[in-house]
Amino acid sequence: MKKIFLIFIICILMCSCNKNNEARNDMYKIGYSSNLIDEKDRNELRKVFDEHKLSNVDLFFKWLDDFNKEEDMGCGLKNWDKTDTFIYNDANCMNRYEKIHSKSDGDCRITAYALLQNIIEINTIESEYGTYLMFDMDVLENNEDYKTINDNQLDFINLFNEMDVSNIEKEEYKNVYPNKLKSHDFKLNSDKVSLISVVLHDSDFNTLFVGHAGVLINLDDKYLFVEKIAFEQPYQISVIKSKNDLIELFNNRSTYFGDESAKGPYIYENDKLLYEYK
């Protein structure tokens, strides 16, 4: 009798898991993105975050709800649609945000770090930050909504600080960021979640810097890419079939590409080079 009861319970659990997976598959269609306007989308994403043990989940949704609560005002927010249709009006998004806020919100790097904070290990060798983190640090130090992240600002600085390449051959630029992370004993303790970094080259100042960052979650049959586009710009999740789809996603964003003298950009998963634009 006990054996029959145990089998019955297992069957119920399996059916429940299958229903959850079916619901997720219906929502997460490959090639589609969302700004998480609907509560159903947010609740499903929260489940994914909890399953993968991401950090600061409540805080993330507080930031998200705060950004999404106003009328669109020409920013370009929407529910699920094909990823290549997500084109934002930067000025309208900023005006929309600043209508009710006196301090800037976080950006891509702050959001990515917040979600990964408890599963990242990194030695804090550097204590000073450069020009390219100036606005990030202003938010962390002056906006109370980001106090939790600011309490660990040395980890944040060491993860995203700029890199001088004045004395490095251009052919070696692609190795600078992963070598930096390795020198800091960087480790991300998950086999399903990873940090995606877009490293850009400022040829005027011989500098490499992390121009964009996001979180990639492996859902077994697809990937979910979670990002905040920029300061005072939307949050976006995108469903992709493979990591190669990230290359196409970033390729459509002209702001990541400098003049002809600039190398890259370089796309990394944690400390591994995924792609070098040439």
Regions found by a protein language model. Name each.
Residues 4-13:
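Sec-dependent N-terminal signal peptides
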Residues 15-278:
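Cysteine-nucleophile amide-bond enzymes
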